[in-house]
A protein has these predicted regions:
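TRNA-recognition modules of translation machinery and tRNA-sensing kinases, especially anticodon-binding
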Residues: 1-157
Length: 157
């Protein structure tokens, strides 16, 4: 028998029944909140080029990323953050669209945790990006939606 055929790697876990239902309820509540405020859903690839995240000001530790090499020798990573891939998407796919652009996502990020302390390396994230509006009203909207989303989570939605 293979040694690791029946276990998950450290930092990962299976989700069953109630946990799946809870996650879906939260995601649906947040999706409703985002869409009611004019945000549109995007999904970025789970696998991105390392270069997307390899800038000194990104605030990401390269040692905490899951790195892979593709069949052409290029370094790729499992998505450790959602904001940078969305910035890439806007710059490459939506640059001709009218701004501001309101986007949301519900997808996992993958970061190696040096000390697991009960945390997993795959974390479900939900969030919004308001791109192209530097006004205070835009900042207030983003903060208000984040606060509303957190209240929904605390309320058990």
């Amino acid at each position: 028998m293979k040694q690791y055929a029946k276990v998950t790697p450290e930092g990962s876990r299976d989700l069953l029944f109630e946990e799946c239902d809870d996650r879906r309820r939260v995601e649906n509540a947040l999706t409703g909140l985002y869409e009611a405020n004019g945000y549109r859903k995007v999904i970025t690839p789970t696998l991105e080029f390392f270069d997307v995240f390899n800038s000194g000001d990104a605030g990401l530790d390269a040692d905490e990323m899951y790195k892979l090499t593709d069949n052409r020798g290029r370094t790729t990573v499992l998505r450790p953050d959602n904001t940078l891939p969305i910035a890439r998407l806007v710059a490459t796919r939506l640059s001709e669209d009218a701004f501001p652009v309101r986007l949301y996502y519900n997808q996992s990020v993958f970061v190696r945790t040096k000390e697991l302390a009960g945390r997993t390396d795959e974390v479900a994230q939900s969030g919004i990006e308001l791109i192209g509006d530097g006004s205070m009203a835009a900042d207030i909207q983003v903060i208000t939606l984040a606060f509303s989303g957190a209240l929904n989570r605390v309320a058990g939605v």
